[in-house]
């Protein structure tokens, strides 16, 4: 249960397996964001338990979640616009030559080399790692954010609407990167309203309604209309899937 601005939202008896790509879908207010905030350490449940990799966890902050191997790609990307690509990938994880009291000297060459390796592993090509991310396109910025998450979040990556603000070609590139993560056996949870994308990228869909997961279905066994019926609670004949794509 979570309290935010006098509003209560409960997530009850819900579980998601690992080693798969899973999408979370549901109408606004269904509990998707609350669920994500809880597993990424942004908010703490007032009661109940969260288990990760078979162990109970109590994340007090996003840092706790990251230290457990959970990385998040937010809609706003959480990038530092005035820093270059390498500095963003190593944000909070800088490699130091040595420290002298409050002063530290960064090993920028090692950071740049490692950044190139992480980008290559994710299938991303960026010619100049010294450019500020503010000068990059939305798709390139998203690629940097995903590469950073994939580099440090080997146990789970959570993506919030990963292509919401991108054009057709940039969306295609980001989707290719997400598929690359599957080939690397990196589990991913995607929050999305785009059912076409969901069916293309994930193995299972967790449908949220009224603060709980009401069903988890395999994309190979259902249609878009089936999922819309679960989202709305209506017979699938009463609403067209196009309204959710």
Spans of model-derived segments:
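H-loop/switch region of ABC-family ATPase nucleotide-binding domains
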Residues: 192-193
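Single conserved hydrophobic/aromatic residue that forms the stacking wall/gate
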Residues: 1-7, 11
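A short, surface-exposed alpha-helical micro-motif characterized by mixed small hydrophobic
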Residues: 198-200
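Catalytic Walker B motif of ABC-type/P-loop ATPase nucleotide-binding domains
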Residues: 157-160
């Amino acid at each position: 249960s979570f309290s935010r601005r006098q509003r209560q939202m409960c997530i009850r008896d819900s579980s998601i397996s690992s080693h798969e790509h899973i999408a979370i879908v549901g109408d606004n207010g269904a509990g998707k964001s609350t669920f994500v905030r809880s597993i990424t350490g942004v908010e703490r449940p007032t009661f109940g338990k969260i288990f990760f990799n078979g162990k109970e966890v109590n994340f007090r902050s996003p840092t706790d979640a990251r230290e457990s191997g959970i990385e998040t790609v937010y809609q706003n990307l959480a990038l530092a616009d005035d820093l270059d690509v390498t500095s963003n990938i190593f944000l909070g994880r800088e490699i130091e030559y040595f420290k002298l009291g409050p002063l530290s000297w960064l090993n920028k060459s090692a950071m740049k080399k490692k950044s190139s390796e992480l980008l290559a592993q994710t299938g991303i090509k960026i010619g100049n790692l010294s450019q500020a991310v503010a000068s990059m396109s939305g798709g390139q910025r998203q690629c940097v954010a995903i590469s950073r998450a994939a580099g440090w979040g080997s146990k789970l990556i959570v993506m919030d609407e990963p292509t919401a603000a991108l054009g057709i070609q940039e969306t295609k590139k980001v989707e290719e990167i997400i598929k690359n993560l599957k080939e690397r056996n990196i589990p991913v949870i995607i929050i999305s309203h785009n059912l076409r994308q969901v069916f293309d990228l994930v193995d299972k869909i967790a449908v949220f309604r009224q603060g709980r997961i009401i069903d988890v279905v395999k994309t190979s066994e259902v249609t878009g209309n089936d999922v819309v019926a679960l989202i709305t609670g209506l017979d699938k004949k009463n609403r067209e899937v196009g309204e959710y794509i």
